[in-house]
Amino acid sequence: MDLTVEPNLKSLITSSTHKWIFVGGKGGVGKTTSSCSIAIQMALAQPHKKFLLISTDPAHNLSDAFGEKFDKDARKVTGMDNLSCMEIDPSAALKDMNDMAVSSAGENGNDDLGGLLQGGALADLTGSIPGIDEALSFMEVMKHIKKQEQGDGESFDTVIFDTAPTGHTLRFLQLPTTLSKLLDKFSEITGRLGPMLNSMMGSGNVDIAGKLNELKANVETIKEQFTDPDLTTFVCVCISEFLSLYETERLIQELISYDMDVNSIIVNQLLFAEFDQEHNCKRCQSRWKMQKKYLDQIDELYEDFHVVKMPLCAGEIRGLNNLKKFSQFLFKEYDPVADNTVIYELEEKN
């Protein structure tokens, strides 16, 4: 029986069970291009389903990649009926939180608190907290789950995350466990001080314990889903260089410690110089020799992974048409001989 793992993402692209797909790795290795490519291929392969691509990276690139503006509200990609994008903007989300807090304080008769928050005090305070970007991204996941449970608003079959560089992503993935422990402590405190805390919130009879229990239930749901390999997977993105390979291994070990499924690696920016005599040069040959050395290590280390080898293109991979051309090699692996002309056929984008 042949146990060779296919060097493509066909099984993921055609998956009918996955709800959450994370795409991450070291900065500058092509995470955004890879996440856009996965989202496009899934949307093309499963036209009856809806897909959402979310950027959790503070330096948002989805708008640049597609050549159209996205913001904190999901909006369809022009030319794709079943693919939407959104970029989580921490400053806008914090302003919304502050406005909601002001409104809530006013409704509950707590004018002093409302006056304090009116100047954006909550946004200023929370904006300076380390990891606030990851927390806001996590809130979007919770909102999405709530919508699905309640059948409220537009829901999506699969959410693909274009994540921030490795450190931010690991903090994001730790949030379910961290929040779960934190909420346990809060529940303990509210059990003892509930009536006093409720009186401090004003006359609105806010059930703090009830809200905490509801939040904890949502967090536990996410925790369960993130550790279910049928529902969630992580796709690592790297280039064939020492530092990128080292960070990819560190990332994979961390993901395994979180019980998260990871079995795919996209290796970007490969030259395949020996197959391209027309555009060959000494620098390309030297670079390709170095790339091959680390590719061999990747193949040896991750023989049970889907290792997808993607070519370095002659132009920028921007705009839907260029992304479609590039992304086809996730579904059917790139052939340096047969597909060589494709990497020189990208449209120029202003």
UniProtKB/Swiss-Prot annotation:
Gene3D superfamilies: P-loop containing nucleotide triphosphate hydrolases. Its main location: cytoplasm. It is found in: Cytoplasm; Endoplasmic reticulum; Golgi apparatus. Its EC number is 3.6.-.-. Zn(2+) binds at C281, C284. ATP binds at K26, G27, G28, V29, G30, K31, T32, T33, E241, N268. InterPro entries: Anion-transp_ATPase-like_dom, ATPase_ArsA/GET3, ATPase_ArsA/GET3_euk, P-loop_NTPase. The active site is at D57. GO terms for biological process: cellular response to oxidative stress; pheromone-dependent signal transduction involved in conjugation with cellular fusion; post-translational protein targeting to endoplasmic reticulum membrane; response to heat; response to metal ion; retrograde vesicle-mediated transport, Golgi to endoplasmic reticulum; tail-anchored membrane protein insertion into ER membrane. It is an enzyme of class 3 (hydrolase). GO terms for cellular component: GET complex; Golgi apparatus. One of its GO terms (molecular function) is ATP binding. CDD domains: ArsA (cd02035). Keywords: ATP-binding, Cytoplasm, Endoplasmic reticulum, Golgi apparatus, Hydrolase, Metal-binding, Nucleotide-binding, Transport, Zinc. Pfam families: ArsA_ATPase. Homodimer. Component of the Golgi to ER traffic (GET) complex, which is composed of GET1, GET2 and GET3. Within the complex, GET1 and GET2 form a heterotetramer which is stabilized by phosphatidylinositol binding and which binds to the GET3 homodimer. Interacts with the chloride channel protein GEF1. Belongs to the arsA ATPase family. ATPase required for the post-translational delivery of tail-anchored (TA) proteins to the endoplasmic reticulum. Recognizes and selectively binds the transmembrane domain of TA proteins in the cytosol. This complex then targets to the endoplasmic reticulum by membrane-bound receptors GET1 and GET2, where the tail-anchored protein is released for insertion. This process is regulated by ATP binding and hydrolysis. ATP binding drives the homodimer towards the closed dimer state, facilitating recognition of newly synthesized TA membrane proteins. ATP hydrolysis is required for insertion. This is ATPase GET3. It comes from Candida glabrata (strain ATCC 2001 / BCRC 20586 / JCM 3761 / NBRC 0622 / NRRL Y-65 / CBS 138) (Yeast).
